[in-house]
């Protein structure tokens, strides 16, 4: 797993090759706060895979959230070789994020 710093200017080059997971969150969101432990577990699981993981705080990069039409927090977008292949919004079970690693 590779943690990658991402912004509106480099998102296309980062998601272009391989598997990339964009995790949109915000400090003001109680739902995102509730999912923090699930996200941390996802990071531990992701270490076993050849993937890029990017955490985006929508209050810091509003344009990136708008570009991907992020409406609910947290939101996980999955990209494979530049194509968006999956979207997960809101609170989910920990197994859901783990399954994203296995299936995408």
Feature locations, PLM:
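Mid-chain, well-packed structural core segment of small domains
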Residues: 58-75, 80
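Short active-site neighborhood of thiol/selenol oxidoreductases, capturing the structured segment around
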Residues: 15-28
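N-terminal "domain-start" segment that seeds a small globular fold
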Residues: 1-13
């Amino acid at each position: 797993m590779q943690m990658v710093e991402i912004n509106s200017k480099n998102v296309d080059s980062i998601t272009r090759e391989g598997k990339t997971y964009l995790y949109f969150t915000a400090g003001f969101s109680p739902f995102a706060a509730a999912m923090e432990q699930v996200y941390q577990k996802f990071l531990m699981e992701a270490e076993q895979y050849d993937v890029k993981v990017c955490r985006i705080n929508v209050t810091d990069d509003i344009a990136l959230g708008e570009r991907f039409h992020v409406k609910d927090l947290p939101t996980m977008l999955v990209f494979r070789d530049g194509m968006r292949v999956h979207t997960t919004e809101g609170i989910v079970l920990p197994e859901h994020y783990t399954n994203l690693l296995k299936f995408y």
